[in-house]
């Protein structure tokens, strides 16, 4: 193995840039995407409350996908990324054994399970907003823009939150040359 190679989970055919500002820029972009998604959804809520002339309004049912996406984002981005590969990188390969390797493998599976629930909440939030759009607006033949726009804004807000989570996940996983890994 060459000195340039490093152990990673995925092999990309291109080199990911590793300068200092990419992590900070990714975090800022993620925050901007979340704020945009929140504002798009809040715009639909405020329009429904104060300017809507139709008989369809934003109710708690419309908030559920948004809350699921937000909770999924919090769960996914609160997991320490080094916990996911902990058991696989131990000396025994994460196999069934005794000692520290078994504990590392257990922690890795717990982290993977929580990560799965976080991504399931994100997917449920996005699919829930699409279902609300279809059932509440399209099936009941509310297909004019100001009324249909409330459902479209719900979907767009959830898409922005999902993209925010993905950008933050990538930004947190970018390794820069100035980070040090100290293990005891």
UniProtKB/Swiss-Prot annotation:
The keyword Plastid does not apply. It comes from Saccharomyces cerevisiae (strain ATCC 204508 / S288c). Present with 1900 molecules/cell in log phase SD medium. This is Vacuolar protein sorting-associated protein 68. The modification N-acetylmethionine is found at residue 1. Glycans are attached at residue 52. It holds the Pfam family UPF0220. Involved in vacuolar protein sorting. The lineage of its organism: Eukaryota, Fungi, Dikarya, Ascomycota, Saccharomycotina. It is found in: Vacuole membrane; Mitochondrion. The chain crosses the membrane at residues 26-46, 56-76, 115-135, 150-170. PANTHER family: SMALL MEMBRANE PROTEIN-RELATED (PTHR13180).
